[in-house]
């Protein structure tokens, strides 16, 4: 299973606001007030087994032209079996789809997804679920300070270079958080079972593929079959299979 860790960076939205009450304006947003719609500034990704992420971005002279970014991301997303990101289900994939359909690109086939923000909210009670906080709390790396987005829109090459570095560091941080949280994620998508040369199923962790595990307990089912629970010695996650006699 090919697992892709990814992150995108987008511009803000520029609006012309004329209102007597700001809360009413926000509630009854009129798209006619859009002076500049958002677009994608860059994207970074890496396969789970890779050491370094890749990145693509707009150019300083055309900071609002994200066609090449979307095309590159469209290709790599199409190669993945599972997507991993922080808030990727609500932000990254929807932002990508919006720009993809803008350019009349075909949809990427549905993927398995692990959103580390959802995992953090479901299984824990962290004081904050922001990626920067999780990195500090879990002691697994760091998240850089955000770039000056306006400078990038103004064509600043130095700030664009920093954004590319920032984008890659987000992917590295997401990978570290994912690996730390994975063993607690009981509904994590499972890798297909591994078989040896004679076709017998090998008891490898379906989450991290670590080859060593311990038997925890077995339990009978109403159907008369039995299930065996294992714990991985690598990621310490649990999984259950049919009892092998």
Over which residues does each language-model region extend?
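Conserved RNase H-like, two-metal-ion catalytic cores of nucleic-acid enzymes
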Residues: 1-77
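Conserved DEDDh/DEDDy metal-dependent 3′-5′ exonuclease domain
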Residues: 49-136
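Acidic, Mg2+-coordinating catalytic module of metal-dependent nucleases/exonucleases
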Residues: 84, 133-198
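Short cysteine-rich clusters marking metal-coordination/redox-active sites
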Residues: 203-208, 232-235
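Cys/His-rich microdomains that often coordinate metals
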Residues: 209-213, 236-239
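Short Cys/His-rich "knuckle" micro-motifs
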Residues: 213-220, 242-245
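Short linker/helix segments within small regulatory modules
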Residues: 218-229
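Short metal-binding segments enriched for Cys and/or His
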Residues: 229-245
